[in-house]
Amino acid sequence: MEIHNLKMIVLYVEYDKTKYKDTLSILMNSLEKISCKKQVIVINNDNNSQSEKKSEYYVLSGTNRNWEFSGWQQGYDYAKSQFDFDVVLFANDSCMNHGKRELISHKLSNDLLLKIYNESRFYGNINLIPDEYGDCFFEEKNVKEWIRTDAFIIPKTIMDKIQKIDYSDTYNIYDIIPNNITREAFINNSYFSAGLTNFLLDWFEKLWHSRFDPFENIKLFQNKTKAIINEKLLSYYIRKHNFKTLNHLRL
């Protein structure tokens, strides 16, 4: 396929326009260098917007129920009902923050997009939990590898197999992290392997740029854990169907 015949859907979830006020304009400018057919859908998760069609993109009113993942799922379901497309670019409003800009702004090109499509490859930032944590399982699924979901591209051939982006309806976060959970109860939970449990605690308390005490903010603990599970299950199902990946850090 030639690049001008390729059709791409862009699903952009925004929540905090004050903190990330320039992200959408930077993203739109970055897309101008791509010669394929593009349709941009903005999912506004701030619960204070209406669905509408603007000159450059559609706007859908999101719920923020499961952060960007429910927004992407809503946008993808809408796109499937309205458009024909070959690849999907997923992004949230932090995709140009914390040194992340190069994934889209610097490395995305016509040649790379054709490679993603022709070889049915996932493109994004793929990370591996350090070996020091040992095995990392969620409900018997090996989730040692995980995808940073500020921005990534998936061909429709992969989406047709994995079927969804938001996996939060496949488990109950309140069973995993009840509102009254203690540190001891979480350490002894039956959902995560010991390695994954230890990694999550280290991530929240030491490694994440917005580190916090999870047992002092249970709501954030629940929501952030849901987001991490979604990232890990996305990677798990891509591997399960034997699709190859392109890690932008190695290009």
Describe the role of every protein-language-model region.
Residues 1-251:
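ER/Golgi luminal nucleotide-sugar-dependent glycosyltransferases, focusing on the catalytic module
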